[in-house]
Amino acid sequence: MKNQIIKKIILYIISIFLILCLIGVYFNKEGFIGNDGETDGEKDGKKDNKPANNEDPAYRDRLFTDLKANIGEFDIIHNEQSEYQKIEVIQFKKNSLGYDKCLLLNNEPQLCNNDEKEYHEIIVHFPAYYISKLEKVLIIGGGDCMCLREIMKYPSIKQVDMLELDKSVISVSKKFFNTDAYENDPRVNIIIGDATKQILKLKENEYDFVIIDTTEDGAINLPIDEFDFYKTCKKMLKKNGVMIKNGDRTLNILSISKLFKNIEVIDLADIAVIGEYKFILGSDTIDFKKTALKNKELPKLKLKKYDYKNHKKHFLM
């Protein structure tokens, strides 16, 4: 009897050991999230500095094949290698979806001129809904200047600081998409350079709203998607401020949820070129699902895609 009990105990211990080994292998492969909000796997990836999948020629071939299949034939009307990335503009030939020009960075579609408002109106006006008086805004990225365009629709704006890594994105967007960088507007300050360094020169507790509108793939964006950078962005906000980040990667959601008392993931309608898209919203003082419209200027704006009356439809249930 005692021998049977001992055997069962030994088998139980061996089973526990094997389970722990399997868990260890899993987290070693997938990456374990530590106190800094990063996975070990992502840290190792940064050290390796391997190119992201979208920089692989095979990825480019698949992307172009999909674009032609889903939308139609196109020409590459602009192609340049800036100091940081490949910048391309493609122009579709006549198609049933009405697509014209699209901007690609390192083989990743960023926007198309016929549906970009679907993205830019949500990333700007959805959070602005919660800000009673929008005066000071910080934009991280946003080199196409389309977030800037939407922000400048608010008469209350006093200051917009935009941190953009690549000045070539601004010039290409101006040339092919007729965007405005507001160079002659004293309220707008565009700072070219590494956002992780430039942001340290700005005042803390200064902004009503922080927008992170950066590319989501490629080595140049790795420092932006770090917990410490999100932490710095939060320091820029006033007490009742709001931050929004494009994309919904699990790591980003976990990092931002560590920083803010309230977070929500909001949904964007499916767009043919970039597909289904989401944003992460964060605040310490605003319960996004329970708070009513605060911004009295928002209902007066002429918008094409975002309707404040249907605000709640964008929440993920």
Which residue stretches match the model-derived regions?
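Acidic/histidine-enriched, beta-strand-rich ligand/metal-binding domains
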Residues: 255-258
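SAM/dcSAM-binding transferase cores
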Residues: 56, 60-75, 79-91, 277-317
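Conserved S-adenosyl-L-methionine
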Residues: 262-271
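The AdoMet/dcAdoMet-binding core of the Class I SAM-like
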Residues: 51-62, 82, 100, 115-246, ...
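Intrinsically disordered, compositionally biased terminal peptides
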Residues: 1-53, 207
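Short, solvent-exposed loop/turn segments that connect beta-strands within catalytic domains
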Residues: 94-99
